[in-house]
Amino acid sequence: MRNRGEEAYNYFLQGYNCSQAVVMAYRDFFPSHALDTILSLSSPFGGGMGRLREVCGTVSGAFIVLGSVYGFNVPGDSEKKKILYGKMQEFAALFEKENGSIICRDLLGLKGRSTPNPEERTKEYYKKRPCPKLCLLSASILEEFLINNGVLDEEGEIKK
């Protein structure tokens, strides 16, 4: 079985930010020619939205994936909007149940916002940060969610 959680974990260790790592674990949801664009679009959500420490980037990455499945592009399509927002809230509740919050600063035990300067990815960084594990958990929760919603098969692959 595919393990998208492990994929997200490994992408984070390769240097992608938390949001990008989750999106990369679901890269097959996007056209291959658009991957650079998707990575650019997901990049501001790392660090709880540009290190503002708001919504966890792994949750935002999952929301981007959910948007690729349930999103809408017609103004005023209230039915599709309702479905998307409902799926987002369901996912957020699952993540929060597992982790206690969807807010970056809460998950990291920080107070307030951070500087815009990203920290260097050293061994000490990975020891003190739950971010790789949160990438794994978010992508795994999303995988189970998408299986339960009939989007992925039991092997974790997109249903044809």
Give the location of each predicted region.
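Short cysteine clusters
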Residues: 18, 56, 104
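Transmembrane alpha-helix interface/packing and boundary motifs in multi-pass membrane proteins
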Residues: 44-52
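Conserved phosphate/anionic-ligand binding catalytic regions in large, soluble enzymes, centered on
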Residues: 52-64
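C-terminal binding/interaction regions
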Residues: 85-160
